[in-house]
Amino acid sequence: MEAPAQLLFLLLLWLPDTTGEIVLTQSPATLSLSPGERATLSCRASQSVSSYLAWYQQKPGQAPRLLIYDASNRATGIPARFSGSGSGTDFTLTISSLEPEDFAVYYCQQRSNWP
C-alpha cells in the first residue's frame, strides 16, 4: 500500500518542473536620462518565448499602455521613436530620443504560455 503513495509523492515533486513558468527580468531597474537622449531597456526571459513579448508604459494613476507587441511591432498610435527587438530570451525596448512625456515606468510581458 505504500508504493502508490510514494509514487504520488515523487510525481508531486516533479510537478514544479513541468509547469513551464517563465520569469522575466528587466534591466536596468532605473535609468537617469534627459530629454533628447536614447533609452535602452532590456528584458530577459528564463526560457524562450519566441517573439511573444510585449512592452507597456505606465504613468501614475493611469492604466498600462501597450507600446510594442510580438517583440517588434508598434501598437496603434505609438510614435516611431519607440522600437522593440529580440527573440527567444533577450529583448530590447529602445526610445531613440526621449520626450518629456516618455518618463514613466516600463514593463515587459510574455504571452507564450498563459496559465
UniProtKB/Swiss-Prot annotation:
Residues 44-54 are annotated as: Complementarity-determining-1. GO terms for biological process: adaptive immune response; immune response. Disulfide bonds join 43-108. Residues 77-108 are annotated as: Framework-3. GO terms for cellular component: blood microparticle; extracellular exosome; extracellular region; immunoglobulin complex; plasma membrane. Pfam families: V-set. Residues 21-115 form the Ig-like domain. Residues 109-115 are annotated as: Complementarity-determining-3. Residues 70-76 are annotated as: Complementarity-determining-2. Residues 21-43 are annotated as: Framework-1. Residues 55-69 are annotated as: Framework-2. One of its GO terms (molecular function) is antigen binding. Residues 1-20 form the signal peptide. Keywords: Adaptive immunity, Cell membrane, Disulfide bond, Immunity, Immunoglobulin, Immunoglobulin domain, Membrane, Secreted, Signal. Coiled coil: none annotated. It comes from the Eukaryota. It is found in: Secreted; Cell membrane. PROSITE patterns: IG_LIKE. V region of the variable domain of immunoglobulin light chains that participates in the antigen recognition. Immunoglobulins, also known as antibodies, are membrane-bound or secreted glycoproteins produced by B lymphocytes. In the recognition phase of humoral immunity, the membrane-bound immunoglobulins serve as receptors which, upon binding of a specific antigen, trigger the clonal expansion and differentiation of B lymphocytes into immunoglobulins-secreting plasma cells. Immunoglobulins are composed of two identical heavy chains and two identical light chains; disulfide-linked. This is Immunoglobulin kappa variable 3-11. It comes from Homo sapiens (Human). The gene is IGKV3-11.
